[in-house]
From Swiss-Prot:
This is Mitochondrial import inner membrane translocase subunit Tim8 B. Coiled coil: none annotated. One of its GO terms (biological process) is protein transport. Probable mitochondrial intermembrane chaperone that participates in the import and insertion of some multi-pass transmembrane proteins into the mitochondrial inner membrane. Also required for the transfer of beta-barrel precursors from the TOM complex to the sorting and assembly machinery (SAM complex) of the outer membrane. Acts as a chaperone-like protein that protects the hydrophobic precursors from aggregation and guide them through the mitochondrial intermembrane space. It comes from the Eukaryota. It comes from Mus musculus. Belongs to the small Tim family. One of its GO terms (molecular function) is metal ion binding. GO terms for cellular component: mitochondrial inner membrane; mitochondrion. Heterohexamer; possibly composed of 3 copies of TIMM8B and 3 copies of TIMM13, named soluble 70 kDa complex. Associates with the TIM22 complex, whose core is composed of TIMM22. Disulfide bonds join C36-C59, C40-C55.
Length: 83
């Protein structure tokens, strides 16, 4: 197998990092849904009632908003540190 050039290696690292981010995001969503399920679903049935659907939606939205706010703030701190 031929050795990778610097550009190929950088591209490979970028692709691996992107896949890791996707996997981390998916894991977070599953974790949020598990927490929200425990909080919102009293007794599972064949269908979710509107109250439960609203609770689940609001719960996940809160987690996502919080995560985005923390991530944005962290990025600002890192950017200021790099200047």
């Amino acid at each position: 197998m031929a050795e990778l050039g610097e550009a190929d290696e950088a591209e490979l690292q970028r692709l691996v990092a992107a896949e890791q981010q996707k996997a981390q995001f998916t894991a977070q969503v599953h974790h949020f849904m598990e927490l929200c399920w425990d909080k919102c679903v009293e007794k599972p049935g064949s269908r979710l009632d509107s109250r439960t659907e609203n609770c689940l939606s609001s719960c996940v939205d809160r987690f996502i908003d919080t995560t985005l706010a923390i991530t944005g703030r962290f990025a600002q701190i890192v950017q200021k540190g790099g200047q």
